[in-house]
């Protein structure tokens, strides 16, 4: 079997991002048969339909999404919703012909944030994913606090319980991709 290629997309751009820490941990602990890459969003501009020639960072993002069998969306919570960098990445991808980059693609969501561990933002993101026709895996969910010591000063995930949840989610995503393929 070819390995499942998963693309991580992180809604936070800061160097010590805890959401990026979640994705890094996932990449380092991907199960056998799964490879995780992480998209570079730092240079991706806001979606603008006037940009007929797509900027290089957008082209790279779209190519990464195209080759991915599944998406792993790391979703910070900004003002009760998903962060703009993540929404912007999905907006760019959604404008390709017939939404072919996203429609039917399996995906899972994880997040690190304030009091509710990004629950509000994640459920908002799920609503967005309905329109995009991404096939989200429901459980296990990964909610975590960015402020309770679960992450070190560089944003690395150090909480063993959350680490276990991420590993469990990756296994579930792998099964989900296999089910959708069969
Ligand atoms: C503009 C802004 C709005 C935020 N609003 C919320 C919020 O509504 N709920 C919440 O739990 N955290 C909120 N936070 C805190 C973020 O969830 C927190 O900074 C999180 O760690 C960001 O992820 P990062 O570590 O990956 O950068 C907000 C942060 C910013 C910058």
Question: Residue locations for each model-derived region?
Answer:
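Glycine-rich phosphate/pyrophosphate-binding loop and the adjoining helix
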Residues: 1-2, 7, 136-182
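N-terminal beta1-alpha1 ligand-phosphate binding loop
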Residues: 2-33
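A generic structural motif
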Residues: 30-37, 135
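N-terminal beta-loop-helix "entrance" segment that forms/cooperates
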Residues: 41-57, 150-151
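Helix-loop-strand module that forms the ligand-binding subsite of alpha/beta enzymes
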Residues: 56-132
């Amino acid at each position: 079997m070819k390995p499942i290629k998963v693309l991580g997309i992180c809604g936070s751009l800061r160097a010590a991002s805890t959401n990026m820490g979640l994705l890094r941990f996932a990449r380092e602990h991907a199960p056998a048969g799964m490879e995780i890459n992480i998209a570079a969003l730092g240079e991706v501009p806001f979606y603008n339909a006037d940009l007929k020639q797509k900027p290089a960072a957008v082209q790279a993002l779209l190519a990464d999404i195209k080759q991915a069998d599944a998406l792993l969306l790391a979703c910070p919570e900004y003002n009760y919703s998903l962060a703009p960098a993540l929404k912007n990445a999905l907006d760019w991808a959604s404008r390709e012909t017939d939404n072919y980059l996203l429609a039917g693609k399996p995906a899972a969501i994880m997040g690190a944030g304030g009091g509710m561990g990004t629950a509000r933002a994640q459920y908002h993101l799920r609503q967005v994913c309905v329109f995009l026709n991404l096939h989200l895996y429901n459980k296990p969910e990964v909610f975590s606090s960015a402020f309770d010591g679960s992450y070190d000063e560089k944003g690395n995930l150090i909480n063993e319980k959350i680490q276990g949840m991420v590993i469990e989610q990756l296994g579930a995503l792998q099964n989900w991709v296999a089910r959708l393929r069969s």
